[in-house]
Amino acid sequence: MPIAPSTYYDHINREPSRRELRDGELKEHISRVHAANYGVYGARKVWLTLNREGIEVARCTVERLMTKLGLSGTTRGKARRTTIADPATARPADLVQRRFGPPAPNRLWVADLTYVSTWAGFAYVAFVTDAYARRILGWRVASTMATSMVLDAIEQAIWTRQQEGVLDLKDVIHHTDRGSQYTSIRFSERLAEAGIQPSVGAVGSSYDNALAETINGLYKTELIKPGKPWRSIEDVELATARWVDWFNHRRLYQYCGDVPPVELEAAYYAQRQRPAAG
């Protein structure tokens, strides 16, 4: 059916509706939030972030506009094993038994390492994470998978807590798998010196160090895979520093009640300082 010229020109010259204007504004905010969070947020986290910023919008609206913009979240892939056990080295007992939900910070730290392929060779990355709020306390990027790398990561974790006034670490369990770096004499002596209790799960069982492997998986999915190709170990180190800062301070973590890890820790300490009711 032919359309009259006047009808066509009326359509293209009409003022945009209130919904169209609102959609245009929201598209800008949605694109900004998605880009600022490494492009990993799906509709739910974009919606939560907008509402945290005071931009009230329905989740279904965010879903509709993200579809129009061609934006989506990411899905974590399967982790690969990196640590290599030393069968000749004695190992501590497993004090965790797959219980990764401690009641407070500084009760359980989990650690693991992974690797990143670069044009200059492999970069090895070690993380130490407090299991209470999934906060990364220490990390290290190195060109070799040596004991010194995991020592540097635990030193940073200890330093992080010391800067916050936590000097007594006797309640901390440090849990890893049977990787030779974590069962070495040097590493074991450093844990003992700090008063930290060592705990070791099994190699080959992802469940025995599931939380640490989750952190590695998020790191690979959110930073490493989208950032390929990596030119140098230094590039990986700089990008990792930025990602850890975002992860701890801005990334909404569902386990934490959709707040960043540092916010959950702060809420824990604020609750303890609050006078008892009654």
From Swiss-Prot:
Transmembrane spans: none
Provide the alphabetized UniProt keywords.
DNA recombination, DNA-binding, Transposable element, Transposition
| PROSITE patterns attached to this UniProt entry | INTEGRASE
User: Which pairs are disulfide-linked?
Assistant: none
Instruction: Give the Integrase catalytic domain ranges.
Output: 101-268
Q: What Gene3D superfamilies is this protein classified in?
A: Ribonuclease H-like superfamily/Ribonuclease H (3.30.420.10)
According to its UniProt entry, the protein's GO biological process terms are: DNA integration; DNA recombination; transposition
InterPro entries named in the record:
HTH-like_dom, Integrase_cat-core, RNaseH-like_sf, RNaseH_sf, Transpos_IS3, Transposase_IS3/IS150/IS904
Do you know which Pfam families this protein is assigned to?
A: HTH_21, rve
Q: Which GO terms describe its cellular component?
A: plasma membrane
Q: Which domain of life is it from?
A: Bacteria
Citing just one GO molecular function, the answer is: DNA binding
Determine if Disulfide bond is one of this entry's keywords: no
Function description:
Involved in the transposition of the insertion sequence.
Which named protein is this? Putative transposase for insertion sequence element IS986/IS6110
